[in-house]
């Protein structure tokens, strides 16, 4: 799992796969082959806790090594209230000398805004995409 990796990278593909398997297992034991509302809530809660735990532990590790004056949480993830709560708790308890900045919900946009701006700039520059263009999730802007 990413939480035990020695680097500072985040990846949730393993977590998402684990959730998929857990959901399928739960659905198999339910008579209607669906999750109950309680099971959905439980899965969402556990997913959020696991995702936030990785972010907090990796951030603490980075703060310990690089000694920044400020930790900034921005982008779509900054809208997550649990992440904000745990980040404030971590800074207060373990790194009181570090300033924590969390963008407001209004400014907590995700990659869609960045992609839209990039597309707009390409349009302004009259950049054309070839018709045989293939989607690539790792394509640079």
What spans do the regions from the language model cover?
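Acidic, glycine-enriched active-site microenvironments
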Residues: 1-141
């Amino acid at each position: 799992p990413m939480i035990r990796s020695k680097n500072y990278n985040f990846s949730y593909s393993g977590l998402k796969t684990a959730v998929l398997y857990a959901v399928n297992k739960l659905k198999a034991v339910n008579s209607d082959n669906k999750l109950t509302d309680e099971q959905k809530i439980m899965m969402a809660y556990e997913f959020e806790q696991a995702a936030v735990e990785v972010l907090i532990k990796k951030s603490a590790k980075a703060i310990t090594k690089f000694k920044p004056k400020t930790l900034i949480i921005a982008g779509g993830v900054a809208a997550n209230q649990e992440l904000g709560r745990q980040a404030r708790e971590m800074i207060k308890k373990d790194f009181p000398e570090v300033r924590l900045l969390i963008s407001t919900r209004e400014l907590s946009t995700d990659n869609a805004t960045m992609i839209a701006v990039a597309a707009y700039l390409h349009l302004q520059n009259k950049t054309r995409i070839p018709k045989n263009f293939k989607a690539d999730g790792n394509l640079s802007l």
